[in-house]
Amino acid sequence: MSTMTVLRLMLETLTSRLHAAISRVCEADMTPLAETGELLRIMQIMQREAIGSEHDREGDKDAKRRRLRRLREKIARLREHNEHPVGNSHEAAYQANARIKTDDVALAMIDDALKGL
């Protein structure tokens, strides 16, 4: 499977989670909007990586591994930064938890892809 295919599958998974979060916004509770924003943030990072992977050769597992590890490092740095909420309100804590949860999902997907290489 090419790097582009792996990243595309990850984006499709995140897109389905995004769709589910948006459909929950119609409820009285608007908190899924935070999750929606976080999913979009991670999807944008993955999309940039997918654009860069278009020139990778089809069978080049080393390039795929390097690209996925670099992506994992970026998201891990973001997750570490998100562990420190800005502000003392409940909303700040909720935002930080939403970011961490989304980062953890992305990291797990990347780890699964790396195990398959």
Residue locations for each model-derived region?
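Short amphipathic alpha-helical heptad-repeat segments
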Residues: 3, 7-22, 60-79
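Alpha-helical oligomerization interfaces
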Residues: 35-38, 63, 94-109, 113
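Amphipathic alpha-helical protein-protein interaction segments
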Residues: 29-54
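Residue-level detector of intrinsically disordered terminal segments
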Residues: 3, 9, 29, 42-45, ...
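Alpha-helical coiled-coil heptad-repeat register
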Residues: 72, 76-79, 83, 97, ...
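A structural signal for well-ordered alpha-helices, especially hydrophobic packing surfaces
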Residues: 18, 22, 43, 47-50, ...
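Charged, low-complexity interaction regions
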Residues: 22-34, 56-58, 83-95
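Short intrinsically disordered terminal tails
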Residues: 1-5, 52-61, 86, 108-117
